[in-house]
Swiss-Prot record:
E.C. no: 2.4.1.-
PANTHER family documented for this protein: GLYCOSYLTRANSFERASE, UDP-N-ACETYLGLUCOSAMINE--N-ACETYLMURAMYL-(PENTAPEPTIDE) PYROPHOSPHORYL-UNDECAPRENOL N-ACETYLGLUCOSAMINE TRANSFERASE 1
Superkingdom of this protein's organism: Bacteria
Family, per entry: Belongs to the UDP-glycosyltransferase family.
Pfam families listed in its UniProt record: EryCIII-like_C
GO molecular function, one term: hexosyltransferase activity
Keywords, sorted A to Z: Glycosyltransferase, Transferase
Main function: Involved in glycosylation steps downstream of mono-O-methyl-glycosyl-p-hydroxybenzoic acid derivative (p-HBAD I) and 2-O-methyl-rhamnosyl-phenolphthiocerol dimycocerosate (mycoside B) during the p-hydroxybenzoic acid derivatives (p-HBAD) and glycosylated phenolphthiocerol dimycocerosates (PGL) biosynthesis.
GO biological process terms, semicolon-separated: glycolipid biosynthetic process
Entries under Gene3D superfamilies matching the protein: Glycogen Phosphorylase B
SUPFAM superfamilies recorded: UDP-Glycosyltransferase/glycogen phosphorylase (SSF53756)
High-level lineage: Bacteria, Bacillati, Actinomycetota, Actinomycetes, Mycobacteriales
Listed GO CC annotations: plasma membrane
Protein name, per record: PGL/p-HBAD biosynthesis glycosyltransferase Rv2958c
Length: 428
């Protein structure tokens, strides 16, 4: 009599052993992923934090390394945290403001030693770093695939110019004459910034990355850009360079008491200068908006140096940034990508007050896309800020451009975990 199988029953000849002593199938080992954030600024910590949190813990054993200075803002970490040295934020920001080399050979040598220690202890399958330039050496020496997180405007293949940042010389001599000298000497300045990492790479038997600062900031076995091509276009990207999309994060803070009772009869301006904005600029902004028919909600990022808070302004140390941007008509910030991406994701235009090169590059991309206005900070005054706010509030084209970028952001951010997992599979 012929034997038959019912649905779901493979039958006696399916090749599956039912012997009691059959060895169980081996359980696939979870890949061990180490994320490293460079805590010079908050942005370079929260991006790897969001990435790490997005991965499926049943598939990945996640470890997170950073200086703990921002841990209180991150809240409870759902994975092991490993403290790692980062130079004080104030020191880095001061050097950037002065136009000085912010990572010298001695600093990077210490970073490499700290990296190698933690890489040896954790033995990850992959290391993901955000602005931790030393991983260009330490990960290669350890033979561990290295994924670099960066912004697309630092890509060697990006379509952009290099604007003059806010440096002491522009304050003393003015932007125009310094711009002429800057255009002449910028390649030399960038080459000097490349020296420390290239020297250490050669010392450890690795090839030089050359004299293009963009290669220093984007070096990795695999590089992910936290941008979209609609905002920062590139050309002829290498196969191991991919757009990731925006990495959005807001602190999990309790809204202030005034959050639910704001006036609704006037447009809201969300003002925040983040952890790297000028200390006195927020006061200039609040003074500029004091006599306008707007409501201002402002976050000081824990750096409250305000001497006067106008009647139309509501201030807190920290605000839920995505929610604040979503209820605003304009976001006014330091031009850095974390806050501008929150604004654009909500379809809200931006007024940026950039100081360093990173912020200038980001804001110039927004201006080219029609979704923002850049104000230089050297001689910033209340009249200029007020005029820019009036311009953006009255110009429908700014809102339309911001909404177009919000549509571009959508699919990239929705596929965020898949982007990461695809990258991990490609480098493993």
């Amino acid at each position: 009599m012929e034997e038959t199988s019912v649905a779901g029953d493979p039958g006696p000849d399916a090749g599956t052993s039912t012997a009691p002593n059959a060895a169980p199938e081996p359980v696939a080992r979870r890949q061990r992923i180490l994320f490293v954030g460079e805590a010079a600024t908050l942005a370079h910590v929260v991006r790897p934090f969001v990435l790490a949190r997005s991965l499926d813990p049943s598939r990945y054993e996640v470890h997170f390394a950073c200086d703990p200075r921002f841990n209180k803002l991150l809240g409870p970490l759902p994975f092991p945290h490993h403290p790692i040295h980062t130079v004080p934020s104030e020191e880095v920001l001061l050097k950037i403001a002065q136009g000085r080399l912010f990572y010298n050979t001695r600093t990077l040598r210490k970073y490499i030693a700290a990296d190698r220690k933690i890489l040896n202890e954790i033995a990850p399958d992959v290391v993901v770093g955000d602005n931790r330039l030393s991983l260009s050496v330490s990960a290669r020496l350890a033979g561990i695939p290295y994924i670099a997180i960066a912004n697309a405007y630092w890509s060697p293949q990006a379509r952009r110019r290099f604007p003059l940042p806010d440096v002491p010389w522009t304050r003393f001599f003015g932007v125009r004459p310094v711009s002429i000298l800057y255009r002449l000497y910028r390649p030399l300045i960038f080459a000097l910034y490349c020296l420390p990492l290239n020297w250490l790479r050669r010392k450890h038997g690795l090839s030089s990355l050359g004299w293009d600062l963009c290669r220093i900031f984007t070096d990795g076995d695999y590089t992910l850009y936290a941008d979209v091509p609609e905002l920062v276009p590139t050309y002829n990207l290498p196969a191991n360079h991919r757009y990731l999309g925006p990495v959005l994060w807001s602190p999990d803070v309790k809204p202030p008491t005034w959050w639910h009772s704001l006036p609704t009869d006037r447009p809201i301006i969300y003002a925040t200068l983040g952890s790297s904005g000028g200390k006195n600029l927020l006061q200039v902004v609040l003074n500029a908006l004091a006599d306008l028919p707007v409501t201002v909600i402002a976050a000081t990022a824990g750096r409250n140096h305000l001497k006067n808070v106008p009647a139309n302004a509501f201030v807190a140390d920290y605000l839920p940034g995505e929610a604040a941007a979503a209820r605003s008509a304009v976001v006014l910030c330091n031009g850095g990508s974390p806050t501008t991406q929150q604004a654009l994701a909500a379809g809200v235009p931006v007024i940026g007050l950039p100081s360093n090169m990173d912020q200038h590059l980001n804001m110039e991309a927004l201006e080219r896309a029609g979704a923002g206005v850049l104000l230089r900070t050297e001689r910033l005054n209340t009249e200029g800020v007020a005029a820019a706010v009036k311009q953006v509030l009255s110009g429908a084209e700014f809102r339309q451009a911001a909404r177009r970028l919000a549509e571009a952001f959508g699919p990239d951010f929705a596929g965020f975990p898949q982007h990461i997992e695809s990258a991990l599979r490609l480098v493993c």
